[in-house]
Amino acid sequence: MTKSYSESGLMGEPQPQGPPSWTDECLSSQDEEHEADKKEDELEAMNAEEDSLRNGGEEEEEDEDLEEEEEEEEEEEDQKPKRRGPKKKKMTKARLERFKLRRMKANARERNRMHGLNAALDNLRKVVPCYSKTQKLSKIETLRLAKNYIWALSEILRSGKSPDLVSFVQTLCKGLSQPTTNLVAGCLQLNPRTFLPEQNPDMPPHLPTASASFPVHPYSYQSPGLPSPPYGTMDSSHVFHVKPPPHAYSAALEPFFESPLTDCTSPSFDGPLSPPLSINGNFSFKHEPSAEFEKNYAFTMHYPAATLAGPQSHGSIFSSGAAAPRCEIPIDNIMSFDSHSHHERVMSAQLNAIFHD
């Protein structure tokens, strides 16, 4: 009889080992691959760390370099301002010539403009009521006087009445300097102290002004509708020949004469004038007597200038007593000669009173 497998004792006895099977080979190969992959990963990680360290150092160096460059640029900007706009081109000969030509044209335009302005101001100085052969008004004074003159004329046209000379001059001299005011007053034959009392606080208040002592009469000029002399249409030297009517001072001179004064008929303009005389600030002009007047009124007696100074000079004239000749001056003839000014008439009245005493 045959033995069974269990009985043969195979279960208890070790079996001899045979050659490795294909599964073992597969497992061993997989383990090797895993180990190789791990090594490669470790190498890659080490290389990556080394690369990162290297790159980090380079980046830090680059950052430091950039910071240093920025600091240097900021320092340069602080030292030198940054120029804006187009860069300066190189100056060539052609550009220099064009530049000089443009500059010459601009200078010529400015010169012509100033010449035209000065010519217009000269024409304006001839029109405004202020004339002087020795003094020239400044530009600002000329413009101010012209503005006041236009304002005064517009007020006259608006009111339609003949203006008062004092108020007219006050309007003209508003805002002007004292020298210009004196020139305007001299051209209109007025004393600036009479119509500008507020500028002279030392002037006594009891002294009357020109408008209070002598009635102001408007002058009659050839130009109709204008209250001031026609400075633009007439020669400036003729302005000073204009005289007020003789009856303007008759009320003030009547106490010096025995009979009332009569009006004198004479032309509005007289002959040539001698240089002006200044009496108490008033501008008056001495007329040169003609040859006929010298023949008709030739005085044979010559009196010293001190005879008009005071009463102590009277003895030198009348020292001979009753034997001295009495000289009477024909007042009517003198008053009929209209070339005498106000102060000359007063002097003749005083002489007549002395001779009649």
Swiss-Prot record:
Coiled-coil ranges per UniProt: none
Phosphoserine: modified positions: S162, S259, S266, S274, S336
Predominant localisation class: cytoplasm
Domain of life from the UniProt record: Eukaryota
Gene deletion effect: Mice are deaf and die shortly after birth due to neonatal diabetes that results from developmental and functional defects of the pancreatic endocrine cells. Show a loss of enteroendocrine cells in the small intestine, airway and alveolar epithelial cells in the lung, granular neuronal cells in the cerebellum, hippocampal dentate gyrus and sensory neurons in the inner ear due to extensive cell death that occurs during the early stages of differentiation.
Chain's role: Acts as a transcriptional activator: mediates transcriptional activation by binding to E box-containing promoter consensus core sequences 5'-CANNTG-3'. Associates with the p300/CBP transcription coactivator complex to stimulate transcription of the secretin gene as well as the gene encoding the cyclin-dependent kinase inhibitor CDKN1A.
Example GO molecular function: RNA polymerase II cis-regulatory region sequence-specific DNA binding
InterPro entries assigned to the protein according to its UniProt record, in alphabetical order: bHLH_dom, bHLH_transcription_factors, HLH_DNA-bd_sf, NeuroD_DUF, TF_bHLH_NeuroD
Effect of S162A: Reduces weakly phosphorylation. Reduces strongly phosphorylation
Keywords assigned by UniProt, alphabetized: Activator, Cytoplasm, Developmental protein, Differentiation, DNA-binding, Neurogenesis, Nucleus, Phosphoprotein, Transcription, Transcription regulation
Stretches with biased composition (Basic residues): 81-93
Conditions for induction: Up-regulated by NKX2-2 and NEUROG3.
Annotated segments matching region Disordered: 1-94
Protein name in UniProt: Neurogenic differentiation factor 1
